[in-house]
Amino acid sequence: MEWNTFFLVILIIIIKSTTPQITQRPPVENISTYHADWDTPLYTHPSNCRDDSFVPIRPAQLRCPHEFEDINKGLVSVPTRIIHLPLSVTSVSAVASGHYLHRVTYRVTCSTSFFGGQTIEKTILEAKLSRQEATDEASKDHEYPFFPEPSCIWMKNNVHKDITHYYKTPKTVSVDLYSRKFLNPDFIEGVCTTSPCQTHWQGVYWVGATPKAHCPTSETLEGHLFTRTHDHRVVKAIVAGHHPWGLTMACTVTFCGTEWIKTDLGDLIQVTGPGGTRKLTPNKCVNTDIQMRGATDDFSYLNHLITNMAQRTECLDAHSDITASGKVSSFLLSKFRPSHPGPGKAHYLLDGQIMRGDCDYEAVVSINYNRAQYKTMNNTWKSWKRVDNNTDGYDGMIFGDKLIIPDIEKYQSVYDSGMLVQRNLVEVPHLSIVFVSNTSDLSTNHIHTNLIPSDWSFNWSLWPSLSGMGVVGGAFLLLVLCCCCKASPPIPNYGIPMQQFSRSQTV
């Protein structure tokens, strides 16, 4: 037991020695009272949505945003100036144009009976596609896919005739402004480092070019720097309208030719005091990877942030219901709305599918009596953002004679039950299926398609019927003729035979 305690103490010392800590004893005259905590606003609504980022997702791909509360107990704050490198989802550098490259086998199967009747079935088979093959085929032109003519052999079943096709489907994906990685729900784990990018569909790769390096324009904001009273350790920086920037594990990194402080979540900031003097000088980062972060990242390891598990549990329950039932209601979908302003994922329903894309969420501080408009933190009144002319809006909103906002409607004593109506979700089809059908079976490597009628397939089913009837009729007629034309046996004679005598003979 004593040895275990000794090794535990040594381990704690090692961890503390390897964790960069920023300490600062702020002058008493600079300490200010900061009462505002990072509270959940009345509502959050998406703005600056990038339409081309919205793609259909399966229920299993839904993800609950992290909910948290920021408590300033035991901290003192000093006013400071913070330079922040913002990441806007509307930036032109945040997208990459490309296309999906498919490799599939179009198969025609023919079965022929004794009488010539034929059954023709068309199917599409997913074909394996290697990364190198995707690279080689990406720059080539490919013909539009088609099924081969059937190969039918008398009294043979399941005669296959295959043809393999490559073809392209245009697709724009998101790009991480920091790491230059490609982001899309269709990718394995939703992220890809370099093109070609493998998708969760076998035989489908995304191919595109990485945009040129781009350095966002920084913004200078007035905020506060927070220090713990007992050890004078700097723990966070806060600016109104932004999520707290944790500094318990902060370090410095060079990006776009400038030295930045990399926060606990990976944001890049600079902290300066009055007159532009530098206030923080953390150690150099061991991990210099820079990637785009948002307001919905994991705050659970930060000591000064308390995760709001009540709201998160509601979202997890909604996710469980949607996944188990294959149905979704506006109320359930509203649980996936980020409750804090900043970059986030927005959802809406379209033709039985859940669409998800990138938006900037802004805080709503007031809603007018008829819910036609909302007021933002800068006292600007705005109209609710709609998805084209659909009645289903972002995060479960329903537009109609009355605007229904599930997270507001749930507080009414008499609420609109329309938000509780569940609708069936349709499967997200394989990309190849758009050429032949609207349904697919993604649970196997075989894409099932029903019999696809065409001119020649119809003729193949008609003539065997006529020929079969002719064969049967001819055989019956031949049997009748054979029976009728067969020679009859001689008729037996039962009379008394008469003898023939010569004329000269007297009887």
Swiss-Prot record:
Side Intravirion, residues: 483-507
BP GO terms, sorted: symbiont entry into host cell; virion attachment to host cell
Species per Swiss-Prot/TrEMBL record: Viral hemorrhagic septicemia virus (strain 07-71)
Signal peptide: 1-20
A single cellular component GO annotation: membrane
Stated name of the protein: Spike glycoprotein
InterPro entries attached to this UniProt entry: Rhabdo_glycop_CD, Rhabdo_glycop_FD, Spike_prot
Membrane topology recorded in Swiss-Prot or TrEMBL: Single-pass type I membrane protein
Gene name as annotated: G
Chain positions carrying an annotated carbohydrate: 30, 378, 389, 438, 459
Stretches in topological domain Virion surface: 21-461
Localization of this protein: Virion membrane
Cross-referenced Pfam families: Rhabdo_glycop_CD (PF24833), Rhabdo_glycop_FD (PF00974)
Transmembrane region(s): 462-482
Annotated keywords: Glycoprotein, Host-virus interaction, Membrane, Signal, Transmembrane, Transmembrane helix, Viral attachment to host cell, Viral envelope protein, Virion, Virus entry into host cell
UniProt function note: This protein forms spikes on the surface of the virion. It is responsible both for the binding of the virus to susceptible host cells and for inducing the uptake of the virus by the cell. The interaction between the internal components of the virion and the portion of the glycoprotein exposed on the cytoplasmic face of the plasma membrane probably directs envelopment and virus budding.
Family, similarity comment: Belongs to the novirhabdovirus glycoprotein family.
